[in-house]
């Protein structure tokens, strides 16, 4: 019985490590696909955070939050000015996180 218990724990650890690796790979792909194109440092920071929240720190991330972070990744890569990055962030927030949606 002890062997089966340890075998189960080991299998769970191996499975969780594989999932974490997939998330890390998706995070890296996200950074390469979006943040690496940024010309504005604040937009790059917002996109890096969005990638992190979607693929690394996504425990209990709501669908509204997922949609918000994806909105940032969809619209921030071409931003060249901080003021526009802030406008995109506010618009994504209003569209996806508003209490009225």
Where are the regions a protein language model picked out?
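Mitochondrial intermembrane space
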Residues: 12-101
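Bacterial N-terminal signal peptides that target proteins for export
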Residues: 1-7
């Amino acid at each position: 019985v002890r062997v089966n218990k340890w075998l189960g724990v080991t299998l769970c650890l191996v499975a969780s490590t594989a999932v974490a690796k997939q998330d890390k790979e998706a995070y890296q792909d996200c950074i390469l696909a979006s943040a690496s194109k940024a010309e504005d440092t604040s937009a790059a920071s917002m996109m890096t955070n969005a990638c992190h929240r979607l693929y690394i720190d996504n425990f209990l991330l709501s669908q509204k939050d997922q949609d918000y972070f994806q909105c940032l990744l969809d619209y921030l890569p071409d931003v060249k000015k901080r003021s526009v990055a802030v406008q995109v962030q506010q618009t994504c927030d209003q569209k996806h996180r508003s209490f009225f949606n």
